[in-house]
Amino acid sequence: MQSANLSSAKSFRNIGLIGRPDKISVVETLCLIHDHLRGLGLHVIFDQETAELVPYTNVQTASRSLLGEVVDLVIVVGGDGSLLHAARALVRHHTPVIGINRGRLGFLTDIKPADALFKLDQVLKGHFQLDRRFLLEMEVRTKGETLYDAIALNDVVLHSGKSVHMIDFELQIDGQYVYRQHSDGLIVSTPTGSTAYALSGGGPILHPSMDAIALVPMHPHTLSSRPIVVGGQSEIKLTIRENRVLPMVSADGQHSVSLNVGDCVHIRKHPFKLNLLHPPGYDFYMACRTKLGWNQDFDLIKEQDDS
């Protein structure tokens, strides 16, 4: 993780705002940030969906896909899911993103609402840590023709949809046959996603700086099947075999598409990275302790001893 070195660090003049819909606390935080930024003389642009949430008129808006072209920084107010959704639209513009947590865990949206204005002021003055996160790109092909493609910041997941039946697929890495597996599916995760669904599936936690991809089987029929960590440049191919149900594949859990026998899912690193910003003092291991409850018992004992 690097200290502030973005060329735009001294020119955060145009600020984009994105908020999670249908949550009153998000609207309150958006209004607080909007008024603060305007008070600093900065130009604020809402994405079109977010503009419908706030009680302002005559605000400037831009579509989610174009917002990254017209702003120097995007502030996302919501949970990690909100930032995931925004990241996929913004990554091609290389626009820096920072998150205010109005969700649950907040691994990506790591600033508490109570600290938002103070932390944002630090970032606007050029005091921040730059955290470059890679994404995955996924293609579904049949007979060499691309049927569907998507990008993911967290993970690409092969799963059985609403069915309780296991699915049958073959895994190749860099053109080498690895195994054929009967399981509920496979999670292909970035380091960012290693603290999300992959963690729930028994996968390892990867430090965000690692150039690696984790492959986590979901309830495999073979007990010896374990998570595999491969290099970030690896080309992963999943081939669908005969199944009682139609498997599905999703990117960041946002949209699933059905797969047929013989379809292939190709997964590799996306050429662009997300420029995620953190305020000074950000510590990944502290985030793990806080979000995952590490040290809880020891901290409780220490509090009791100190009392």
Swiss-Prot record:
Its EC number is 2.7.1.23. The active site is at D80. Its cofactor is a divalent metal cation. The keyword ATP-binding applies. It catalyses: NAD(+) + ATP = ADP + NADP(+) + H(+). One of its GO terms (molecular function) is NAD binding. The keyword Amino-acid biosynthesis does not apply. GO terms for biological process: NAD metabolic process; NADP biosynthetic process. Its main location: cytoplasm. It is found in: Cytoplasm. One of its GO terms (cellular component) is cytoplasm. NAD(+) binds at residues 80-81, 85, 154-155, 165, 182, 184, 195-200, 254. Keywords: ATP-binding, Cytoplasm, Kinase, NAD, NADP, Nucleotide-binding, Transferase. Pfam families: NAD_kinase (PF01513), NAD_kinase_C (PF20143). It is an enzyme of class 2 (transferase). Belongs to the NAD kinase family. PANTHER family: NAD KINASE (PTHR20275:SF0). Involved in the regulation of the intracellular balance of NAD and NADP, and is a key enzyme in the biosynthesis of NADP. Catalyzes specifically the phosphorylation on 2'-hydroxyl of the adenosine moiety of NAD to yield NADP. NCBIfam families: PRK01231.1. This is NAD kinase. It comes from Acinetobacter baylyi (strain ATCC 33305 / BD413 / ADP1). The gene is nadK.
